[in-house]
């Protein structure tokens, strides 16, 4: 694998997108629900606060902890994508490109939304 600036940028964007997909996106909620449960409580001011309760023990609890931590998930996503690049480079290149484009599109959308609100 050749490591250059473009590779680092593409991998970074791909890891960003994959980690957000796993930790935050609604489409992955059914997967996350296998490992943790979201609880809601009202605080003293009447605001609803959501917190996560990890399910199970052992591997299940480990995955639940992982999926509740964006930074932790990002490290594992980076490892997964680098391993894919080493083992199945052709398929990994397409996956990384797809995730990188989606990640950059998400960043652009956030910036444009904030810009339009001002």
Curated annotation (Swiss-Prot):
Sequence intervals crossing the membrane: 8-28, 62-82, 92-112
Keyword Transmembrane helix attributed: yes
Pfam families referenced in this protein's UniProt entry, alphabetically: DUF1360
InterPro entries per the UniProt record, alphabetical: Mycophage_PG1_Gp7
Main location: membrane
Compartments (UniProt record): Cell membrane
Coiled-coil intervals: none
Any single biological process term in GO: sporulation resulting in formation of a cellular spore
Keywords from the named record: Cell membrane, Membrane, Sporulation, Transmembrane, Transmembrane helix
Cellular component aspect of the GO annotation: plasma membrane
Record's bilayer topology term: Multi-pass membrane protein
Function: Involved in sporulation.
Family: Belongs to the UPF0713 family.
Name of the protein in question: Sporulation protein YjcA
Lineage: Bacteria, Bacillati, Bacillota, Bacilli, Bacillales
